[in-house]
């Protein structure tokens, strides 16, 4: 059976006139038809498939006069023109098979159609969608109870088979690329990678950790604040051997905060800068810092309070925001010696050495801040006072030595009267070679450091609260306590010599900070 298309037949088709401008042929420029198929077009397609077989649907228009695209010809043959195609409704066996296949495969209609000869994927899809709506309206389950369990088991097995197939393909790819596919991390210990509850990187107040802290180079070292993502590795590098012990001793941050510093120092084998007996300032013999300035001074000036968190570095300052001088005037008793305690260590320390030992002192105070300037001025003043004392000692008459005893007696009486007004600060024990015998026996009284530039502002509370600053021997006794008993006696001898009329020891030659009134 052959069919020859004529121009009259093509022109008589209304679909060709309407859709001719939308779809063009790729090789002869003729318009392709769209829409429903006619019986004549079905005969042309059947004759072509019988002669050439199925496949290469784009060649149908080339070998015949059928103006249809290849996709349209394929769908027309598969869904309507095949000789083994079944028409009509699905049988009960086919419906049962469709439910089982859908429970295993899902919406893979083409694969399901391969198991149903004579049925198309479109028919199976239409049947399933109709069945879903019908069972939903009736309130019935989509799958039978015994088939639903099988579907779940099959879906798990199918998912495993897919994963195994993908792994096999990846393994083949790795083997083609000369790579090792089987890589196991058996020796990797993930417990070491988990950060503990107690991190040494947070302890910024604990400096001079370990044995290396005794070196002068590391005396002013402070641990910086490190992000949590980097603390694990860097903390082990800074403090090896402490992480494992701390993780065993402390299970929570609350337990660490409630634990005394002595226990922590025994655990990690490093010195703790805080003492339980001095909660405000800490231990004054430990590596500490200036209050409110956070400047390390290697044990000379203590902390204002123990710190456990991050510390913001600031420049040193003697401006105390919490306590003002006006509040000192209003108080009935002298203020606590909190502001003066940091400078008691200067008084308790022996006179600064001269000569070659000054370089060691400068190395300990090598902070480049106000502490360096104060120490340098103090050393220079001591050297000037010693020179003046040598020049004045030779000219003091022997008859005036009795006045020295009188002045010493007045200074001792002033010390006794001062005890009832000033608050005594506890003095920690020191070594015998570092502290004179007299300083170990007598408790230290908080006195003003006249070398500081802001001492004049703080001296106003003595005028109103005590009323004893105007006494003649107050300044001499303060210098005696500040610079040591021996140097204080030197100043008293110099004052006696000046009252005797010695011209070579005039007070105008002294530095402004060391001038004092003459004793009567």
Curated annotation (Swiss-Prot):
Residues 29-81, 82-136 form the HTH myb-type domain. Residues 57-81, 109-132 bind DNA. One of its GO terms (molecular function) is sequence-specific DNA binding. Mostly expressed in stems, shoot apices, flowers and floral shoot tips, and, to a lower extent, in roots (e.g. root tips), seedlings, leaves and siliques. GO terms for biological process: anther development; anther wall tapetum morphogenesis; gibberellic acid mediated signaling pathway; negative regulation of cell population proliferation; negative regulation of growth; pollen sperm cell differentiation; positive regulation of abscisic acid-activated signaling pathway; positive regulation of DNA-templated transcription. It is found in: Nucleus. Gene3D superfamilies: Homeodomain-like. SMART domains: SANT. Pfam families: Myb_DNA-binding (PF00249). It comes from the Eukaryota. Induction: Accumulates at the shoot apex upon the transition from short- to long-day photoperiods leading to flowering and after gibberellins (GAs) treatment. Repressed by microRNA159 (miR159a and miR159b) in vegetative tissues. Specific expression in floral organs and in the shoot apices is regulated via miR159-mediated degradation. Repressed in germinating seeds by miR159-mediated cleavage in an abscisic acid (ABA) and ABI3-dependent manner, probably to desensitize hormone signaling during seedling stress responses. Slightly induced by ethylene and cytokinins. Keywords: Activator, Developmental protein, Differentiation, DNA-binding, Flowering, Nucleus, Repeat, Transcription, Transcription regulation. Residues 1-24, 331-359, 426-447 are annotated as: Disordered. Disruption phenotype: Hyposensitivity to abscisic acid (ABA). Reduced expression levels of aleurone-related genes (e.g. CP1, CP, GASA1, BXL1 and BXL2) in seeds. The triple mutant myb33 myb65 myb101 has a male sterility and exhibits slower protein storage vacuoles (PSVs) vacuolation rate in aleurone layers upon seed germination. The myb33 myb65 double mutant is defective in anther development, with a tapetum undergoing hypertrophy at the pollen mother cell stage, resulting in premeiotic abortion of pollen development and male sterility. Residues 331-342 have a biased composition (Low complexity). GO terms for cellular component: nucleus. CDD domains: SANT (cd00167). The keyword Nucleus applies. Transcriptional activator of alpha-amylase expression that binds to 5'-CAACTGTC-3' motif in target gene promoter. Positive regulator of abscisic acid (ABA) responses leading to growth arrest during seed germination. In vegetative tissues, inhibits growth by reducing cell proliferation. Promotes the expression of aleurone-related genes (e.g. CP1, CP, GASA1, BXL1 and BXL2) in seeds. Together with MYB65 and MYB101, promotes the programmed cell death (PCD) the vacuolation of protein storage vacuoles (PSVs) in the aleurone layers during seed germination. PANTHER family: MYB DOMAIN PROTEIN 81-RELATED, TRANSCRIPTION FACTOR MYB33-RELATED. This is Transcription factor MYB33. The gene is MYB33.
